[in-house]
Amino acid sequence: MTDAVEVLRIDSLEDERLDAYVRLTERELRCVLEPQKGIFIAESAKVIERAVRAGYEPVSFLLGERWLDQMMPLFERLVVREGAGPVPVFVASMELMEQLTGFNVTRGALAAFRRPRQIPVDEFLGGVVEAAGDRPVRVCVLEGSVDHTNVGAIFRSAAALNVDGILV
């Protein structure tokens, strides 16, 4: 284990270091510190790994104890690739994770990441058009959707339909 991977055992959801996972609403997460420095929560090892590969900056990780060995190589790659300082890895019992989420956490891992800067719509669309080359472009626009389950389903459907970009 590298020095920059800081594993911290958690025994209570009252721990202030877990605020992003336990006590903050989606709106509060968007506005943590300043709007441009908000955070978002990623759920599952697969989603976390994709976020890391996409270059999102992790704030912390929270996982069930049985996931630590599986996730440690990802944490170590992140530290080596990014040269990041210590990123806390909070480890809790699976029972505590279930208490947090209200259900059996089969995917066992959560992560808080810094939100990327919001880019202007025209800049986003320009990038989508450029990436598409000569073929027609398909963009999905989400307006007023607040349920993360619906948003996740829409993103998965958009990926299956080869949508080029999603405006949220």
Where are these regions (language model features)?
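Glycine-rich phosphate-binding loops that contact phosphosugars or nucleotide phosphates
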Residues: A111
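A generic local structural motif
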Residues: R27, I48-E49, M97-E98, A153-F155
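Broad gene-expression machinery/nucleic-acid interaction feature
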Residues: G108
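RNA substrate-binding interface of SAM-dependent RNA methyltransferases
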Residues: V5-L8, K46, R53, R81-P86, ...
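Phosphate/diphosphate ligand-binding glycine-rich loop within oxidoreductases
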Residues: R66-V105
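Boundary-proximal intrinsically disordered activation/regulatory segments immediately upstream
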Residues: M1-R77
